[in-house]
Design a protein with these regions (language model features):
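Intrinsically disordered, low-complexity N-terminal regions enriched in serine/proline/glycine
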Residues: 2-5, 25, 40, 45, ...
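Anionic N-terminal interaction surfaces
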Residues: 2-26
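Intrinsically disordered, low-complexity boundary segments flanking structured domains
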Residues: 11-12, 35, 57-59
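Amphipathic, interaction-prone secondary-structure segments
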Residues: 17-47
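Residue-level marker of intrinsically disordered, low-complexity segments enriched
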Residues: 22-23, 50, 55, 109, ...
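Acidic, aromatic-enriched beta-alpha/helix-loop junctions
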Residues: 46-91
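Low-complexity intrinsically disordered segments
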Residues: 73-127
Length: 127
């Protein structure tokens, strides 16, 4: 997704009445389409998904596709919004993108480090 298309996507999110806001944080040349990070703010919870798929994943784990989720509940999402200066879900996603997208496929790890440093609790699971 080009920066221009991505910016339009974020602008549409600001005016969306749906409680679900999502965006691709990082996907460009140099990082394969098999590795991407998506942030979702939905139902007052914040979630970061790091998806990895491909032959090496199948060899190591017996599955082509692994999804690693980091999830913050409502209270910790509010704390994350406070720590990032965001006022709503769309603002939170924009702030997360601004701060962490440049880390590429390491963005999930960087967000986790930020949360730990700020005392924000999250849960993790993998499918």
């Amino acid at each position: 997704m080009s920066y221009k298309k991505y910016k339009k996507f974020l602008e549409r999110l600001q005016y969306q009445s749906s409680p679900t806001h999502s965006c691709i944080l990082y996907q460009r040349e140099g990082i394969s389409a098999d590795e991407f990070i998506e942030a979702t703010y939905s139902n007052k919870c914040f979630q970061v998904l790091h998806n990895v798929c491909g032959e090496s994943v199948k060899e190591d784990y017996g599955d082509w596709d692994l999804e690693h989720f980091m999830t913050l509940d409502e209270e910790n999402t509010k704390l994350l919004m406070l720590r990032t200066g965001s006022h709503d879900g769309a603002g939170l996603i924009k702030e997360i993108e601004k701060r962490f997208a440049s880390a590429g496929y390491l963005a999930k790890k960087k967000i986790e480090e930020f949360c730990m440093a700020k005392g924000i609790t999250y849960s993790e699971h993998c499918y």
